Swiss-Prot record:
It is found in: Cytoplasm. GO terms for molecular function: ATP binding; tRNA(Ile)-lysidine synthase activity. ATP binds at S22, G23, G24, L25, D26, S27. The lineage of its organism: Bacteria, Pseudomonadati, Pseudomonadota, Gammaproteobacteria, Lysobacterales. Coiled coil: none annotated. It catalyses: cytidine(34) in tRNA(Ile2) + L-lysine + ATP = lysidine(34) in tRNA(Ile2) + AMP + diphosphate + H(+). The keyword Endoplasmic reticulum does not apply. Its main location: cytoplasm. GO terms for cellular component: cytoplasm. The N-terminal region contains the highly conserved SGGXDS motif, predicted to be a P-loop motif involved in ATP binding. This is tRNA(Ile)-lysidine synthase. Disulfide bonds: none annotated.
Length: 437
């Protein structure tokens, strides 16, 4: 990159940009380039610096970034984050999680978060993903992706670090050198310091070729993702569960993609390769009444009645939680779900004749359904209506004294049905998204 070389244009001219500014070479060049564009200044240019508190120089780095932004008349957001040392994901990953959360909190709706990843970073990412056996991961970093309320933009992926260094020297820029970038305990540093220089000795264009491979992999992934998006809806029931017979009609490679797409669509953590293997080996061929399960990252995939369900386990409801509910306003449940009455003619909800008790199941409850004279165990009734076992524990019971009037909105006793029909109302139970994704 030279002073006169063209800088990648923002995909949507006129949209404000927030630059992730660490004070290092890459982000300094990116912020300076954008600040040199009068039109971008008019439409909005700000920076954000993350103070991780992990390095003894963190305060000095923050001061450096503040001085740079003051000199160039750029508003700077300083986000001090707490990085957990006991998250179970490693310090580097925990710092990345905290950093992304700060970015998401600051980025405004529709705005762009600009990151200074360059061609060399892309090559390192491609090698790391290849060494980890990640097929879709070979697409590495995308130039533009949705992020939080806006978009994540990487305008420097076609520029090498050498070009950025030339630019910085021509502009007489000062930047921070982070000593942790020389720590060989980190895989990325090892690749940058030892592996890539050897590749360049033999193949001078190695970095550009690896980055081009990432772009080709991204194009192929986009095609496959589009196919997955067409196929997946036909495999889902109204609750979002995956039909096993429909899934197994596809070959194994496509099944793996559909399982991952299903998890991603539901907002679940990425499904690891181990999970795909366990699902293929244990869940898909299990018996009809099997309760087979795969657990990862506080998330479960359970098999039940020829369906696969995504589920996030929740703690049991407090045993003393037994509020009285009038029905005039929604009742928020301990797991974040709710009970409410819905008017079928859009009139004001009148509420019950007297407040009713709401509580969790304790076991052994029985219910008399409309048209029947004898009570039946809730366990059997819930099985009959197809409620998965793990969801039953979070179903609220609506009681009038000792009489059970409703179990969620799946089972209603005759007196409640009569009253609801007379008042043109429906009882609705909305379970929380974290309970069943």
């Amino acid at each position: 990159m030279t002073v006169s070389s063209p800088f990648p244009r923002i995909p949507d001219p006129g949209v404000p940009v927030l630059v992730a500014f660490s004070g290092g070479l890459d982000s300094t060049v990116l912020l300076h380039c954008l600040a040199s564009q009068p039109t971008q200044r008019i439409h909005g240019l700000e920076a954000i610096h993350i103070h991780h508190g992990l390095n003894e120089n963190a305060d000095a780095w923050t001061a450096h970034c503040a001085a740079f932004c003051t000199q160039h008349d750029i508003r700077l957001h300083i986000a001090r984050v707490h990085v957990s040392h006991n998250s179970g994901q490693g310090l580097e990953a925990a710092a990345r999680t905290a950093r992304r959360a700060a970015f998401a909190h600051t980025l405004q709706h529709g705005h762009y978060l600009a990151l200074a990843h360059h061609c060399d970073d892309q090559a390192e990412t491609w090698l790391l993903r290849a060494l980890r056996g990640s097929c879709d991961g070979l697409a590495a970093m995308r130039p533009l992706t949705p992020f939080a309320a806006g978009h994540l933009w990487r305008p420097l992926l076609t520029h090498s670090r050498a070009q950025l260094l030339d630019y910085a020297q021509q502009q007489h820029l000062d930047w921070i050198e982070d000593s942790s970038n020389a720590d060989l305990r980190h895989d990325r540093n090892f690749l940058r310091i030892h592996v890539l220089p050897l590749l360049h000795q033999r193949w001078p264009q190695a970095t550009a070729v690896l980055a081009r491979n990432a772009a080709l992999a991204a194009a192929n992934a986009d095609l496959l993702n589009a196919e997955d998006a067409v196929l997946l809806p036909d495999l889902l029931d109204p609750d979002g569960a995956l039909d096993i017979n429909a899934l197994t009609a596809h070959p194994p490679a496509r099944r793996a993609r559909l399982l991952r797409a299903w998890c991603a669509r539901a907002g679940a953590p990425p499904l690891p390769e181990r999970g795909v293997n366990i699902i293929e080996r244990e869940l898909l061929p299990a018996r009809h009444d099997s309760a087979a399960c795969f657990t990862w990252s506080h998330t479960e995939i359970r098999r039940w009645r020829l369906r696969l369900y995504l589920h996030r386990p929740q703690p049991p409801w407090p045993p003393d939680w037994q509020p009285l509910w009038s029905g005039t306003a929604p009742l928020i449940l301990p797991d974040g779900g709710q009970l409410h009455l819905e008017s079928t003619d859009h009139e004001t909800v009148p509420g019950f004749p007297h407040p009713l008790r709401v509580r969790a199941r304790r076991g052994g409850e029985r219910l008399i359904l409309p048209g029947r004279t004898h009570s039946h165990p809730l366990k059997h009734l819930l099985q009959d209506v197809g409620i998965p076992p793990w969801r039953r524990a979070s179903m609220p019971l609506l009681c009038d004294g000792e009489q059970i009037l409703a179990v969620g909105d799946a089972l209603l006793a005759a007196p409640l049905v009569t009253w609801l029909q007379a008042h043109r109302l429906k009882l609705r139970w909305q379970y929380h998204n974290n309970t069943c994704i």
